[in-house]
Every structure is written in structure tokens, then in C-alpha cells.
Amino acid sequence: MSAGPASSRRPSLLRALVRKSEPPRAFYAPEVFGRAAITNIAQALPPLERVYANIRFSILRPKLLSVMDLLLPDEGRILDIGCGFGLFAAYFGQTQPRRRIVGIDPNARRIEMARKVAGKLGLTEHEFMAADARDAAVRGPFDAAYVLDVMHHIPPEDQLPLLERLRDLLSPRGVLVVKDITTEPAYQVRFTELMDRAMVGWEEPLTYRHHREWGEMLSSLGFKVRMVRVPDVLPYPHVLYVCTKPR
């Protein structure tokens, strides 16, 4: 659908803002850059995938992503686990263009789309691999890694080994950011489960854990863990786990 003349100039201006090679961090307004990045990503996708992207960005909204953006390093190698269509790799790559993101996902079709999106956005340093993160042939070290709403889709017996592998791939003082949900309040968990089922169906097992349980698991791996409960207009019980690897 075509926008009116006044609005048609806006995406070009936003692209110019987002693609500045070194946005000055002291004056960086994450939500402004984030909305611009989302606009660019949507325009780089085919119609069906654009619908999916709109759903994902309605769950992980600019306010939440802007918090994560400030937690990740401004530059260096960053690992994206369960990257799908590369939406968040494209997002974080636009807000800080010196980031080199490596995305891993088992779905080859999604990986191919992630490569196309990154190419259209000029993110030539990004890499994408069709593989299972638990045994992917990826080599560290990485300055950071993130796992966004993926852990509760991983079988319980594989969760700790995956997190252990991510720790080993990080450089000293590297940061692992995990975004998942907690198990309270009950109505928010139920809402989240319904949304998950709408996306993946009823056959796939889901493993939701209380935030204290996730915190203990991550701490057992030697991480210094900070837990941040992120409020939202939608009833998702978001929790960010900011995990720093020791020296």
C-alpha cells in the first residue's frame, strides 16, 4: 500500500539516520534509531515475512530492544542464537554498524532470508549459518551473545549444555544477554503460551522456568548475573538476564 507524499519521505530520512557510520553514543536515542531500524527491516522483507516481523517486533518492542542495545558492545563479534530471519541481527547491526553479528538457526530457509535482508541493509559483515546451536561449527571468541525468547523452546536437558557452550565461546568479560519469560503472574504466562502456540503449534514442548531458576543456572556457570524485569504494555512476563563472564 502506498503512503502519502509526506510520509513517503520519512523512511529515507530514517535510513540516513540509522546508517550513519558512527552514531555518537553520548547523544544516542535508542528508541528513535530502533524504530528506524524496524522500518528498514520491514521494507527489506517479502509481504508474508513482513507480517511475521511485525508480530515479533510487537513482542520485543523498541523500548525493550533499546535496553538490550545499550547492554551489547558497540563493536566486535556478537553471536545471535536462534536468529530466524535475522530480524534482531539486522536491528542491532543498524543501531551500531561496527557490530559483526553471526546468526545461527536450524531453519535453512530462514537463514537464506536473513542473508538477503542483511545484504539489502548493507550489513556485509554479518554471517548466518543453518545449524543447531548446540553443535554448530562456530568458532569464538565472541564479545557478546544473545538468546531472545529461544531457551523455553530448547529441551530441558539441553538448556544447560547450550548455555555452557555459549560461555566457552565468549571472550573474558564477554556479555551474554538472555531474554525469556518467568512463570509469574499466571495470567501472563498463559497469555505467552497462547502466543507461542499460535507461532509453533501444539506439538512442540515448551519449558518455562521461574526467573530465580534461570538465575541460578546461569550463576552456576560462573557468570555474574543481573536480572531485569521489563514491564510492557502487553502482558508478557519479560525478564532480561545480563550475564558477564569473568576474566
Indicate where each model-derived feature is located.
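A conserved beta-strand element that flanks and buttresses the S-adenosyl-L-methionine
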Residues: 146
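Conserved alpha-helix/loop element of class I SAM-dependent methyltransferases that forms part
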Residues: 57-75
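Class I SAM-dependent methyltransferase Rossmann-like catalytic core
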Residues: 42-60
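Conserved class I S-adenosyl-L-methionine
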Residues: 75-84
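Class I SAM-dependent methyltransferase SAM/SAH-binding core
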Residues: 87, 91-124, 129-134
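C-terminal alpha-helical "lid/dimerization" subdomain adjacent to the S-adenosyl-L-methionine
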Residues: 179-221, 227-233
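N-terminal, positively charged/glycine-rich alpha-helical extensions of SAM-dependent methyltransferases
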Residues: 2-48
